Amino acid sequence: MENPAAVPVTIGHLMMAQIDDDELPGFKEYIQSRNGVDFISSSMMLSAVDAKLRLEMGAEKMLSEILEPLRDRYDAIIIDTAPTLGALNINALAAADEVIITVNPQLLAMMGLQDFLKTVKKIRARVNDRLSVAGILLTICDARTNLCKVITEQVRDTFEGQIRIFESRTLILLK
């Protein structure tokens, strides 16, 4: 995106409007297109949204309510989030049908993965019974390290046959 500040309505604006019970703008005001891909921009406003969501009743459904009218317009809606587990990510999981779990093969990766799977299970039970795990995607794997190999092996040994493990990895090759 050439100039994010020029975007009049971002997902942050939409979520703030939802929190404040304001009417949402029409699709044309916030859906942008580039190279045949439609998207809703983000901005730093999401930091303020995250803080406000913590004080809001029914906060975990805000994003779901925004995206619901778009479900019939698209074959798939991809929600890209930061690797944290705050109110915004809970919203993303509450709105999703499937989640691809990205795992950076580092020392605490398995612990984080186990915790995240527990969170998915809770969200499925309490908020979104459609949610399922599409698979695990290993990312940022430094093929030169034994740690990467060990964690990759642990993920396979622990989850193979239960959860799909995507074959592609982002390799770090430094000269």
Segments from the language model and where they lie:
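P-loop NTP-binding core
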Residues: 1-175
